[in-house]
């Protein structure tokens, strides 16, 4: 009985630890952008991916059609993976992004919580939320 109780307690701890990952990644990205806003905004308006890649917490940067797409972190293995990052939208409008690409424009996004969500034809989910100025947080679940 004691071994079962210990096993159950460990299972509960590990399952709860996994539940906070999304909110923690989001909070970390908001903090990263807010703490480095001057550097990030200058690099984005100049389309300077190299300057962004120098910041701690940024893993990969893509420049496409005037957008700067920044990957920060991810977890899981498909079909239950999640990527997190932020992007610079030159027109200030939210979009759905994934893997360095823009998936859809504002007109295909649906309001959800403090942001917008896009569901593609599969079971993939893309969420975006305004951080400041032309900068938006994103998460992609696939």
Residue ranges of predicted features:
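Extracytoplasmic electrostatic interaction patches
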Residues: 64-142
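Sec-dependent N-terminal signal peptides of Gram-positive bacterial secreted proteins and lipoproteins
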Residues: 3-21
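Extended hydrophobic/Leu-rich segments
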Residues: 8, 52-55, 116
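Residue-level detector of functional hotspots within protein domains
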Residues: 2-5, 26, 121
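N-terminal export/targeting and maturation segments
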Residues: 19-78
